[in-house]
Amino acid sequence: MSLKKVLTSAGAVATALTLVFAGTTPATAAKVPSKKAKAGDECARAGLSAKGRGAEGTDLRCMTMTTGTASGQLRWWYPDLKPLKNIDWVVPANPGGYSQTSTAISESLKKEGLLSTYTSTFKPGAGGTVGLGFFQEIKAKPESVLITGLAMAGGIPSNKSPLKLEASTPIAKVMREYQALAVPATSKYKTLAQFLADWKANPKLAISGGSLGSTDHQFIGLLAKAAGIDPKAMNFVVHSGGPEVIASLLSSATVAGTSGSAEFQAQLAAGKIRVLAVSSAKRLPGYSAKTLKEQNVDLVYGNWRGVMATADLAEADRLNMVKVFDAMRGTDTWKGYLKQYNWDDEWSAGKEFGSFLKVQLPLVAGVIKDLGLGG
């Protein structure tokens, strides 16, 4: 399967966000009937049941919320849900996109009364496989979770690692994020067309991104192919996180760089970088840059991130954790983070996330092969 076909498929676009970052849901929000209910939706009368509408076919009940931003309101909820006391994150990279996501999850859970405390352990290196290996050695710690995503899915075959992501326990795929292609504000490149013309003439232009096989690498490989450049011939300069990519741009160590769009927001607002294109189907709020498609590059691409628990997690604890994360999805705090970071609400919980991984991981392995890695 071709690089373009695989990544275009992998980057299918979720419904555009129209969510409002606010402390409470507007009073005019419609009550959701039981046959359409999701955890966190408003409901009409306490005690009503929504059979099979929860994660993995579990039931929801219309309940008066006692904590969080919806306190005092009627919401579809899990009657047997137990808030988590602690989450101990393993973050398989330096601070950047992964930790941004894990922090957004943790702060959402805390504010909504679903979590008491959380900690993070950073284990960067080898496309996320250092962190994955560390995580998969953890035993008898039900509070331990791993933040993962497309970067790790690519990092495993890129580094010829024997580790298998699916050996851990899938909890939830929580979002999809789009890429931005950026240059320093002082760059001569004002448009994507100018940059692509020079890149085609000189494929060795230094372009910064994440680790080998990462989301950034996959995206730049696809962009190269669209520009008529052999992805195996490009000069992709690896870094362990978004801040390092930004530093390489600001120091002119690289000509251009890519990362998740949220990574560049602060530097863009400060006027230190210029974004030439974003990889979403529609323009992103806060970015004046056009999409790739608007600039005659037929590419829509997005990175997903998700949460894994340890392989030995007891079934009762697994199902409760799945419910906690699924409940978080419907909260105003989490919806606010989706809006703030331009993330798409692309969600799958528990066994559904496991089914996604069974399809996704072989596809990503094919992408890595097209990049000349992992052979």
Give, region by region, the residue ranges found by the protein language model.
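C-terminal region of N-terminal signal peptides and the immediate post-cleavage residues
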Residues: 18-36
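N-terminal (or domain-start) structured segment
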Residues: 78-166, 212, 216, 228-256, ...
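A structural signal for short loop-to-beta-strand junctions that line the ligand-binding cleft
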Residues: 143-146, 162-180, 206-208, 293-298
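Beta->alpha turn/N-cap motifs
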Residues: 146-152, 158, 241-242, 258-264, ...
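Flexible hinge/capping segments at coil-to-helix
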Residues: 183-203, 316
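Periplasmic-binding protein-like
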Residues: 201-202, 326-343, 368-369
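Ligand-binding pocket segment of bilobal, Venus flytrap-like solute-binding proteins
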Residues: 208-289
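C-terminal lobe and pocket-closing loops
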Residues: 263-331, 359-363, 367
